[in-house]
Amino acid sequence: MKHNQNIDFVSIVIPVYNEEASLPELLSRTLAAADSMGKHYELVLIDDGSRDNSANIIEAAAAEPDSHVVGIILNRNYGQHNAIMAGFEHVRGDLIITLDADLQNPPEEIPNLVAKAEEGYDSVGTVRRHRQDSALRRYPSKLINKLVKRSTGVEMNDYGCMLRAYRRHVVKAMLECHERSTFIPILANGFARHTAEIDVHHSERSQGESKYGFMNLINLMFDLLTSMTTAPLRMLSIVGGGIASFGILFGLFLILLRLIYGAEWGVDGVFPLFSILFIFIGAQFVGLGLLGEYIGRIYSDVRARPRYYVQDILVGEATKGARISDENKNN
């Protein structure tokens, strides 16, 4: 049975990092798309420690008469997912939508997510149709999608697309999780009973630079695998067992060749042995790296430092009273 609670209020959460070039267009297009829904809404913009003029643009937008914009200013850069979690702490909506600030995913798709959620889904994901990224972005992303899907067991076709919709109870459940490393789409699907995906348009980035280069994608893959599953550790044990078995068989094979061809064969085979030895040493370092990732995350969790620090919350006078009233009801 699907969740059929009405959606009367929509919160749109957008993390912002050095996006002053695209912010004016983002604001106008997102507000226009939200107006077209015919529902109450708010636009929550989180400045994730930007070094440009992004925070000032957000402040000006929140200060406009009858503004729907809420600005959350973090004291430094904490990363995309932590910034979104900071936004989740201050939303009021029945449905919460996340969106990147680069305009590659059009804000005009927001009403489509709301319509799909109103069919009774707790979480609505998106799949980018005809991606406009370079091959260096597309192919690593496809590889990461396949690896993460196999490792986590979560059925999602496009982990990198942050244009998504979540019911309020899913967001509330995520806020009760306190791990330092969080990947929101996978975490949300763990609390959503009914999930769906829709196709969305994808555009080229017209202004600014992508915050995810090739190495960032590799780091993201490690974050995904080590923060959501212990499958890499199990795989490491399997690979280690396979290497050990191969080593034993290869040793027996060398003994057999030595018996057949004599002691001189062993001298001639020194360099192949060194090559194989380096392969084994490399495998050990990979394993140590994975173990280090997990130990490092345990260390971060034990320190229990906050995932982010909100320096300021910018709310216009028109919406301040409504937010105070809602907070009093929730308390």
Curated annotation (Swiss-Prot):
It catalyses: UDP-4-deoxy-4-formamido-beta-L-arabinose + di-trans,octa-cis-undecaprenyl phosphate = 4-deoxy-4-formamido-alpha-L-arabinopyranosyl di-trans,octa-cis-undecaprenyl phosphate + UDP. Gene3D superfamilies: Spore Coat Polysaccharide Biosynthesis Protein SpsA, Chain A. Pathway: Glycolipid biosynthesis; 4-amino-4-deoxy-alpha-L-arabinose undecaprenyl phosphate biosynthesis; 4-amino-4-deoxy-alpha-L-arabinose undecaprenyl phosphate from UDP-4-deoxy-4-formamido-beta-L-arabinose and undecaprenyl phosphate: step 1/2; Bacterial outer membrane biogenesis; lipopolysaccharide biosynthesis. The chain crosses the membrane at residues 236-256, 270-290. SUPFAM superfamilies: Nucleotide-diphospho-sugar transferases (SSF53448). InterPro entries: ArnC_tfrase, Glyco_trans_2-like, Glycosyltransferase_2, Nucleotide-diphossugar_trans. It is a multi-pass membrane protein. The keyword Glycosyltransferase applies. It is found in: Cell inner membrane. One of its GO terms (cellular component) is plasma membrane. Keywords: Antibiotic resistance, Cell inner membrane, Cell membrane, Glycosyltransferase, Lipid A biosynthesis, Lipid biosynthesis, Lipid metabolism, Lipopolysaccharide biosynthesis, Membrane, Transferase, Transmembrane, Transmembrane helix. It holds the Pfam family Glycos_transf_2. Its EC number is 2.4.2.53. One of its GO terms (molecular function) is phosphotransferase activity, for other substituted phosphate groups. Its main location: membrane. One of its GO terms (biological process) is 4-amino-4-deoxy-alpha-L-arabinopyranosyl undecaprenyl phosphate biosynthetic process. The keyword Lipid metabolism applies. Catalyzes the transfer of 4-deoxy-4-formamido-L-arabinose from UDP to undecaprenyl phosphate. The modified arabinose is attached to lipid A and is required for resistance to polymyxin and cationic antimicrobial peptides. HAMAP family: ArnC_transfer. Belongs to the glycosyltransferase 2 family. This is Undecaprenyl-phosphate 4-deoxy-4-formamido-L-arabinose transferase. It comes from Shewanella sediminis (strain HAW-EB3). The lineage of its organism: Bacteria, Pseudomonadati, Pseudomonadota, Gammaproteobacteria, Alteromonadales. The gene is arnC.
